[in-house]
């Protein structure tokens, strides 16, 4: 098996800053950079799977301060804490785009962003970076887990955050 790719903290920072630095396409909504920043911040601060992030609804945030209700694999529900940077990014996006209910992340036409669209936006930002390898949403998830473990988080906590049913799945990150 190949070694898993883990982004450095400086690469993560570079990636998170890209939406605000890249000029907006003419047809893009004025709030696109805020939405994309919120998506990238949320990916890194929660370790969500791509499908979990795409499926988020505004109601998954409401009434839960700094916590997100996530429906993962096998329709298992879990609560995931959201970092303050991600929370601020989500609030800025929601306010600018006037997203008050329904899907959390929407297109200009107010449709839910698909997993393919989210993957494409990540690739677009990577083309504008000097990050030397292909980053996928799952590699952001790996980086999230590895950085938590490196900072001293215990395996069981990381298992719960990632929504793994088996500890052996989480042990891959050690």
Name these PLM-found stretches.
Residues 1-174:
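Conserved catalytic core of the tyrosine transesterase superfamily
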């Amino acid at each position: 098996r190949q070694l898993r790719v883990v982004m450095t903290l400086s690469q993560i920072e570079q990636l998170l800053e890209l939406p605000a630095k890249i000029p907006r396409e003419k047809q893009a909504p004025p709030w696109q950079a805020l939405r994309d920043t919120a998506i990238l911040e949320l990916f890194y601060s929660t370790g969500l799977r791509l499908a979990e992030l795409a499926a988020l609804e505004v109601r998954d945030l409401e009434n839960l301060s700094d916590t997100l209700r996530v429906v993962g694999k096998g329709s298992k529900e879990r609560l995931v804490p959201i970092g303050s940077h991600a929370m601020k990014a989500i609030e800025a996006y929601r306010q600018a785009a006037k997203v008050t209910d329904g899907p959390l992340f929407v297109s200009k036409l107010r449709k839910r962003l698909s997993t393919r669209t989210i993957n494409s936006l990540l690739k677009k930002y990577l083309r504008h970076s000097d990050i030397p390898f292909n980053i996928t949403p799952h590699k952001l998830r790996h980086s999230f887990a590895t950085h938590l473990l490196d900072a001293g988080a215990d395996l069981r906590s990381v298992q719960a955050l990632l929504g793994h049913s088996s500890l052996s799945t989480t042990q891959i990150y050690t």
